[in-house]
Curated annotation (Swiss-Prot):
Name of the molecule in the record: Small ribosomal subunit protein eS30
Bias (Basic residues): 25-40
Record bears the keyword Ligase: no
Signal peptide: none
Family in the record: Belongs to the eukaryotic ribosomal protein eS30 family.
GO process terms (BP): translation
Top-level taxon of the source organism: Eukaryota
Pfam family, one: Ribosomal_S30
Disulfide bridges in this chain: none
Subunit organization: Component of the small ribosomal subunit. Mature ribosomes consist of a small (40S) and a large (60S) subunit. The 40S subunit contains about 32 different proteins and 1 molecule of RNA (18S). The 60S subunit contains about 42 different proteins and 3 molecules of RNA (28S, 5.8S and 5S).
Known function: Component of the ribosome, a large ribonucleoprotein complex responsible for the synthesis of proteins in the cell. The small ribosomal subunit (SSU) binds messenger RNAs (mRNAs) and translates the encoded message by selecting cognate aminoacyl-transfer RNA (tRNA) molecules. The large subunit (LSU) contains the ribosomal catalytic site termed the peptidyl transferase center (PTC), which catalyzes the formation of peptide bonds, thereby polymerizing the amino acids delivered by tRNAs into a polypeptide chain.
Gene Ontology MF terms in the entry: structural constituent of ribosome
Species: Plasmodium falciparum (isolate 3D7)
Intracellular or extracellular location(s): Cytoplasm
Length: 58
């Protein structure tokens, strides 16, 4: 067995000192087919993936 650097009494000291920050709620990311569709629209369409209205000049 290898030698231990320092006392095991201090194990986890920094993690225990760090304040707990709760996770933020985020919108779920698209997966699968929907993600590929979003990528296609982002790369190849001129309006950022949004549908054009009947009166748009885009």
């Amino acid at each position: 067995m290898g030698k231990v650097h320092g006392s095991l009494a201090r194990a986890g000291k920094v993690k225990n000192q760090t304040p707990k920050v709760p996770k933020l709620d985020k919108k779920k990311r698209l997966t699968g087919r929907a993600k590929k569709r979003q990528l296609y629209n982002r790369r190849f369409s001129d309006n950022g993936g949004r549908k054009k209205g009947p009166n748009s000049k885009a």
